[in-house]
Amino acid sequence: MAIISSKKQPPEPNGEPKQRRESAKAPSTENILKPEAAIDEQEQQEEGIRPHRFADYIGQKDLKDVLDIAIKAAKSRGEVLDHLLLYGPPGLGKTTMAMILASEMGVNYKITSAPALERPRDIVGLLVNMKPGDILFVDEIHRLSRMTEEILYPAMEDYRLDITIGKGSSARIRSLPLSKFTLVGATTRVGALTSPLRDRFGLIQKLRFYEVDELTQIVLRTAQLLKTPVTQDGATEIARRSRGTPRIANRLLKRVRDYAEVKVSGVINESIASEALQLFQVDPCGLDWTDRQMLSVIIEQFNGGPVGLETMAAATGEDTQTIEEVYEPYLMQIGYLTRTHRGRMATKAAYKHLGFTPPNEQLSLL
């Protein structure tokens, strides 16, 4: 069963919107759900950690500048925000950015994912319930079905819904006006979107990996919200092992917090953070056991590559999509993996990190 996540933002006494989570009330949307949007204790805690304003959002300065201009321009003209496509690796803050947009615009938002929109009536139920200016966030938008995409075309471009009534020669199309809304799509595979859908987004922006100093600020902020004592060097140690990703940084902080509470009952410093992350098999470069296994397979079984994606998936036991979207981006970012038309190859840096001798240096030893 799936539930759409819906947010209303009634004004506070100071005039600023306040965020609050509710289930969608319309019967037509109750079965449209994003699996990750199920409301539980863990998500409520994560909701408290999320920033709700640009001022609280750390990193992604270029993206924030672009969106800040778009928001101010839309407000000055009394228009809705243009449709926005956000792309980049998972965990960089695409969903959070959609929530911030709603907060900055003073409107409500709804969250769903493309796999949940299986039938045309699913997206229809969402669209007809949108209020003027509302934001509809669709995660994994590259996975929309063809029929759902075709319904979105006139909805995005002309704010109308074209419904076919009847069948065969007696069929006719009826157009229903929709409230002007903003569609925010998120994807890890922007190239998988069809051109007609991609071209209907007025703004297309990429989220980049975070720098260590940005992640350090995020860890310190999260620790303060969780009432977890952590030193600057302890936060930095967690940050540099977080793969440039805030979601991972917050997750590692919680694991280190558990370790500190059980083992030392004290403040998280660099030494404690290092001990805890070593226990969880996260090395100083942020590689976990699976990352190291993938690189080891390429080096030991395939002499450093090139290795095809399907072959690597079979050798490691991971599915191809997980390899492409979760592991490869960071390994390529830090220079441990390269992709060629023939397949994946481990770099000299990967050899040295895992304690292997690079092939050219092996020849020099003969």
Swiss-Prot record:
Keywords associated with the record: ATP-binding, Cytoplasm, DNA damage, DNA recombination, DNA repair, DNA-binding, Hydrolase, Nucleotide-binding
Basic and acidic residues: bias regions: 15-24
CDD domains in UniProt: AAA
Sequence segments annotated as region (Small ATPAse domain (RuvB-S)): 211-281
Single GO BP term: DNA recombination
Primary site of residence: cytoplasm
Enzyme Commission numbers on file: 3.6.4.-
Molecular function as annotated in GO: ATP binding; ATP hydrolysis activity; four-way junction DNA binding; four-way junction helicase activity
Residues annotated as binding Mg(2+): 95
Binding-site residues, DNA: 339, 344
Region (Disordered): 1-50
Subunit relationships: Homohexamer. Forms an RuvA(8)-RuvB(12)-Holliday junction (HJ) complex. HJ DNA is sandwiched between 2 RuvA tetramers; dsDNA enters through RuvA and exits via RuvB. An RuvB hexamer assembles on each DNA strand where it exits the tetramer. Each RuvB hexamer is contacted by two RuvA subunits (via domain III) on 2 adjacent RuvB subunits; this complex drives branch migration. In the full resolvosome a probable DNA-RuvA(4)-RuvB(12)-RuvC(2) complex forms which resolves the HJ.
Family per record: Belongs to the RuvB family.
Function: The RuvA-RuvB-RuvC complex processes Holliday junction (HJ) DNA during genetic recombination and DNA repair, while the RuvA-RuvB complex plays an important role in the rescue of blocked DNA replication forks via replication fork reversal (RFR). RuvA specifically binds to HJ cruciform DNA, conferring on it an open structure. The RuvB hexamer acts as an ATP-dependent pump, pulling dsDNA into and through the RuvAB complex. RuvB forms 2 homohexamers on either side of HJ DNA bound by 1 or 2 RuvA tetramers; 4 subunits per hexamer contact DNA at a time.
Name of protein: Holliday junction branch migration complex subunit RuvB
Organism of derivation: Nostoc punctiforme (strain ATCC 29133 / PCC 73102)
